[in-house]
């Protein structure tokens, strides 16, 4: 009898832990926008050089759950990203897996409205699958600061 009760409790704990773990690592669009607002405040307070150093840090201040801040210049060159392989690359004309030139959309949006949302498809590093993503971007001087969330 006790073995069945203990087994039942262990199964319940495992199920609860699994459900919690699945939702824990997923950021929302609202959280992504808030990260951009915080990143812009950091940029204004500490300057571009220090801000980009912080954006580039794996597990730095601007990485949380599956969210991370990244930044382009006004020509689509990646200036800040936790993946060092992307830094310095001009990605303006590089499409997503469905052919959308989303970085062009980001630059156009920043130049026309200053801030807003861009949607596209991107490789989710947590699931290793191409997934729909929505990214909030805001222009500050010569930088476009962005953070995106994967959509369910």
Residue ranges of model-derived segments:
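N-terminal membrane-sensor/transducer module of prokaryotic signaling receptors
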Residues: 2-9, 14, 19-152
